[in-house]
């Protein structure tokens, strides 16, 4: 499977948010075991850099973390002009709409997020990490 992963999955891990972090970690392990491909939008890395730097207050540590996470386990995909413009025409949150169009333009099978309600009736398959784990058992 080709999975576009929302920033909230990585934020759960970074901030060690209890059960959400555990499930997110199991999700990442399972993608590796099943040879699924994790895609992440370049804008997600930008967002993560902001949160990490705000926490660690160190550019090098921030960059090292991003390299270790995104450089090793993810394929980074860009945002096209068409994705950016199309997302503006949709109702709802721009960043969520941008993920939808990025998912479609990169032929991903699903978006993985903990906020499924943000993607209702958007025309893409959306899974929580738990749902992915159930599918892959």
Positions of PLM-derived features:
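Short, well-structured N-terminal submotif of metal-dependent ribonuclease cores
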Residues: 1-40, 55-60, 121, 130-137
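Acidic, PIN/NYN-like endoribonuclease modules and their adjacent C-terminal/linker elements
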Residues: 2, 72, 105-137
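Acidic active-site catalytic centers that drive phospho-/nucleotidyl reactions
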Residues: 6, 96, 115
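Alpha-helix capping/helix-boundary segments
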Residues: 9-10, 44, 83, 99, ...
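PIN-domain endoribonuclease scaffold, especially VapC-family toxins
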Residues: 25-92, 97, 101
């Amino acid at each position: 499977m080709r999975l576009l992963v929302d920033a909230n999955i990585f934020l759960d891990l970074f901030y060690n948010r209890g059960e959400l972090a555990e499930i997110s970690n199991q999700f990442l392990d399972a993608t590796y075991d099943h040879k699924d491909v994790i895609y992440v939008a370049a804008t997600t890395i930008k967002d993560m850099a902001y949160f990490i730097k705000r926490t660690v207050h160190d550019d090098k540590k921030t960059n090292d973390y991003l390299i270790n996470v995104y450089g090793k386990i993810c394929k980074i995909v860009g945002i096209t002009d068409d994705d950016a413009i199309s997302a503006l025409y949709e109702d709802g949150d721009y960043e969520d709409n941008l993920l939808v169009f990025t998912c479609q333009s990169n032929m991903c099978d699903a978006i993985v997020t903990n906020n499924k309600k943000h993607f209702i009736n958007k025309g893409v398959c959306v899974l929580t990490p738990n749902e992915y784990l159930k599918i892959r058992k």
